[in-house]
Amino acid sequence: MEVNRMNKTGIAHIYASQNNTIIHVTDPTGAETIAMVSGGMVVKNDRDQASPYAAMKAADMVSETLKEHEITDLIIKVRAPGGNKSKIPGPGAQAAIRALSRAGLKIVRIEEVTPIPHDGTKKKGGKRGRRV
């Protein structure tokens, strides 16, 4: 007789800016936090928080917690600062996704959820922009 096991799914919210990478895993409703690790928690120097290495180590810590909670499937939502800031995810986003997949977690889908302004506030830099 075959045992039909239900795959447990989680949602990994990856916020990747130029200064830090935060990996936050919730249940499918988003109400309960299962694991949350940032780049600053795994490296010593502040300048390394956004590095791919820090994101990889953070993803490894998250995957350990997910194995304890018996979560096998992940929906990944990648977010950049957005708004009137950068709309491109930082260097840690790709490394975090790669580390999560290498840890043996099945990635169901990857979504881009960077907030896009619909003519919101003005970007900093003044009338003539940033002069380099």
From Swiss-Prot:
GO terms for molecular function: rRNA binding; structural constituent of ribosome. The keyword Ribonucleoprotein applies. The keyword rRNA-binding applies. Keywords: Ribonucleoprotein, Ribosomal protein, RNA-binding, rRNA-binding. GO terms for cellular component: ribonucleoprotein complex; ribosome. One of its GO terms (biological process) is translation. Belongs to the universal ribosomal protein uS11 family. Located on the platform of the 30S subunit. Part of the 30S ribosomal subunit. This is Small ribosomal subunit protein uS11. The lineage of its organism: Archaea, Methanobacteriati, Thermoplasmatota, Thermoplasmata, Thermoplasmatales. The gene is rps11.
